[in-house]
Design a protein with these regions (language model features):
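Basic, polyanion-binding surface patches
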Residues: 4-222
Length: 222
């Protein structure tokens, strides 16, 4: 009996039967009502990124592809599908700010998704307050409870496995200054469970929140 056949007839092992698995090759289509990729790789933290152009005009936009990539030094990054104003601004100034999106700021964050001309100030559009950063030129969102001031380390156009360039741009930056609402610090520890983070899910209008009820602890084996 082959290994894959054996796995399919031994349900007590916890392995799924091969007949219960939907498999596909993305370049040939997923065969479902909606591409599940974003829903599977998620929920994801939101890259709510503020930048400014060389003349100092501010821009604010959310990105659903965002995460941390290194601890020391701290490096975060986001991907932009298309060479948008945010990426152009980072290329021009070498700086950006990440602003934490929380449940109370969800509507304002969503407003900054709007496709508007470069001269439109998303801070004004969303009724948000720009606050001067300490080390970089782009402003922070004053209403955001956590902000990272970042200096760009690289901007990279992505490529597929066949070497073909993709119209998506990865921006990485070192976090050079951090600002945290002191109410979120409990005995010197950041209280993620009660900070109200919102996360991007798979559907076009789907989001998740993080709360204490989702918290569980599991230590690494020694």
């Amino acid at each position: 009996m082959k290994a894959h056949d054996r796995a399919s007839v031994l349900p007590h092992t916890g392995a799924m039967r091969t007949t219960d698995i939907h498999s596909y090759q993305p370049r040939q289509g997923h065969g479902l009502l909606h591409d599940p990729f974003n829903a599977i790789v998620g929920p994801r933290p939101i890259g709510w990124i503020s930048t400014c152009n060389a003349q100092g005009a501010a821009n604010l936009a959310p990105y659903s592809f965002f995460n941390a990539f290194n601890y020391v030094p701290p490096i975060v990054g986001f991907a932009s599908i298309g060479l948008k104003d945010t990426v152009r601004n980072v290329q021009a100034t070498g700086e950006f700010v990440w602003n934490l999106a929380t449940r109370d700021l969800a509507e304002a964050m969503n407003t900054t998704c709007a496709a508007v001309p470069p001269e439109v100030d998303e801070f004004v559009l969303a009724g948000l307050t720009p606050r001067a950063s300490t080390l970089v030129r782009p402003p922070r969102v004053a209403e955001s409870r956590v902000t990272f001031e970042c200096r760009c380390t690289q901007v990279q156009q992505l490529h597929g496995a066949d070497g073909t360039a993709v119209d998506t741009w990865l921006v990485l930056g070192e976090v050079v200054a951090v600002h945290i609402d002191k109410a979120l610090l409990r005995d010197g520890i950041y209280d993620t469970a009660n900070a109200g983070h919102i996360l991007r899910a798979g559907g076009p209008a789907d989001y998740f929140t993080v709360g204490p009820e989702q918290l569980f602890k599991m230590h690494r084996p020694r």
